[in-house]
Amino acid sequence: VQPPHSHGDNFYIWT
């Protein structure tokens, strides 16, 4: 599973 790196679903929470 890949971390959410999108400005749509999640706002770079796993940065």
From Swiss-Prot:
Enzyme Commission number: 3.1.1.20
Gene Ontology molecular function: tannase activity
Catalytic activity line of the entry: digallate + H2O = 2 3,4,5-trihydroxybenzoate + H(+)
Disulfide bonding pattern of the chain: none
Key words of the record: Hydrolase, Serine esterase
Thermal profile of function: Optimum temperature is 40 degrees Celsius. Retains 14% of its maximal activity after heating 1 hour at 70 degrees Celsius.
pH dependence per the entry: Optimum pH is 5.0. Active from pH 3.0 to 7.0.
Regulation: Activity is enhanced by the addition of 1 mM Mg(2+) (more than 100%) and by the addition of 1% glycerol (22%). Activity is reduced by the addition of 1 mM of various metal ions, including Hg(2+) (98%), Fe(3+) (95%), Fe(2+) (94%), Ba(2+) (92%), Ca(2+) (76%), Co(2+) (70%), Zn(2+) (44%), Ag(2+) (14%) and K(+) (8%). Inhibited by the addition of 1 mM DMSO (75%), Triton X-100 (42%), sodium azide (40%), beta-mercaptoethanol (34%), Tween 80 (22%), Tween 60 (20%), EDTA (18%) and phenylmethanesulfonyl fluoride (PMSF) (7%) but not affected by the addition of SDS.
Superkingdom assignment: Bacteria
Enzyme class: hydrolase
Family, per entry: Belongs to the tannase family.
Description of how the protein assembles with itself and partners: Monomer.
Main function: Hydrolyzes ester bonds of tannic acid to produce gallic acid and glucose. Exhibits no cytotoxicity in vitro in Vero cells or in vivo in a rat model.
Protein name from the UniProt record: Tannase
Species name: Bacillus subtilis
High-level lineage: Bacteria, Bacillati, Bacillota, Bacilli, Bacillales
